[in-house]
Amino acid sequence: MLTTKDLDEFRLLLGQINRMAQEDLVALWRGLEGLPADDAWRILEQTVPDVVEVYRASAAEASSVFYGDTQKVRFSSGDISKASQLNREQVVESMRYAMFADGVTSPLLILSGVVQKHVINGAREYGLSGFEDTGVGWFRAARAGACEFCRMLATRSVGKYGAAYSSAEAASVVGRGKRQRRTGAAQTGGEFHTNCMCLPVRADMFTPPDYYDRWLSEYNQASELVGTNDLKKLMWAMRNPQKALAVKG
C-alpha cells in the first residue's frame, strides 16, 4: 500500500527538482535587470520554457520510479516522453500575464508559480497518462495543509461519489496541447494550480488520511448551505462558512 511517507518523500524530491528550476529562473531574471521590458520579454519568452522543459522531464522520470515502486504500476516508456512534453503556448501566455498585466507588482513571483506548476505537472502527467491507458481509477492525494480548492477535489470521489476518478475524463487537463479540451475540468479532479503539490495516486493502493473526513464534512456543509454543485459558490462557502450560513438564514 502507498504510505504517507512515500508521498512525503516523493514530494520532497519534486521540491528539489523545482528548486533547481527556480534557481535557473532567478539567474535568468537577474541577468536581464536593467533591460527595457520588451527586450527582457523577448529573451524570457524563449528561455523560460526551455528551463521548464528540462526540469519537467526530470519530474516525469522521477515519477516513473515512484509509481512503479509504490503502486506496482509501470507504464509504457512512451509515457515518460509524453509527460515531458510542454505546452509552450500555455506557459508563454501565463508569462505574458506576469510581465504585462495591470496591477502585477511582482512579475518574478508569478513567473515562479508558472514554472513550479508546469515542472510538477510532468510528474502528474505521467501518472494520469498511465492510469488513462490502463483504465486504473485514481484518487487525488493532498497534503494536510492543502487549500480549500484541493480539499474539495480530494474528497469528491472518496466521499460523495464513492468511486475513484476516471483518468479517461481527467488526464488531459494538466496540459497536453490539443488534448486539453474538456470543460468542467475541476469536476473531474484533474486541475492543478500554481504551488499545488497534489498528486494522482492509484485508488486501490491509497487509504485517505484521517483529515479527509474533516474536509468531507466541510464540503458537505458548504454544499448544503449553497444548495448547488457550482464550483465558485462551493469554494466561497468553504472559505466563508459563517457568511454562507448567514446568507442561507
What is the predicted role of each segment?
Residues 1-34, 121, 125-249:
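Activation/maturation switch segments at domain boundaries
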